[in-house]
């Protein structure tokens, strides 16, 4: 077994292979979990996971790993963590890990050196005290001593609150602000590419629309604020944490428009029949499955989701070669604007 598919996952489990830690008979909770060959190499009795990103959650389910239930009071002798790169989100996840520990339990984490491993290690040490450590696969692995309780409950509570959705003031957003949280794409600002797309939307849109990769809902709020003849709008988003924010941001429109919120992997396709689709597609994925092909998959999903004659409105990094994919799935592909390193395109579904 090699570590090329997910070095951090392989590194995370190394202490059990090396005899540095024992796997608890009562099982473990895995926060930020990802599937990979390291999890298939041997049994991990009682392992359950939580993962808010849909394609990563789907991969864990396909591999046969059990999702954690919703029981908030369950406590674990071991909590595994693959912290995200965004520091506030990672701190919140560490605080959640400590809160989920049974008395005498440990937190074990790993992160790539190139993705903030030293900062993550320092943060867990600040929260939980001295750590055991090792280096493997260009990653840092670090774990707490057995903990009777969080050593610094005040800091743990402060960091746990970092994950709470909060109001962000921004005059470009509908109503002068929006609800978001750390770790969501462009969590504390209106993304420049999305703002460029909004500036070049047409004078009229109507009927059923969708946003593929909706994030916290900026494009959706702008569309619904501008176009009273839109009757239904669906938001498709892979990150459940972002989708929860979008639900709050779309509340002002809920009585006028039929809204749908879908925790969904757009790359696998979406239902059809839309009159228009707006999209600021990701050009990379999460974790070891990151790939430039993801944006192209979004364009193919949009082509299949639109009724014949339906229109796509797209913004993307200027250098990304999406023209061939657009030409394959659409007619009348046009570039509406180029600015700030981005391009806005529109295309008509065949």
Residue positions per predicted region:
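A short glycine-rich, Lys/Arg-flanked "PGG" loop and its adjoining helix->strand segment in the class I
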Residues: 91-103, 296-308
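Conserved SAM/SAH cofactor-binding pocket of Class I
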Residues: 4-63, 192-279
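Conserved proline-anchored active-site loop of SAM-dependent methyltransferases
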Residues: 77-88, 212-216, 274-287
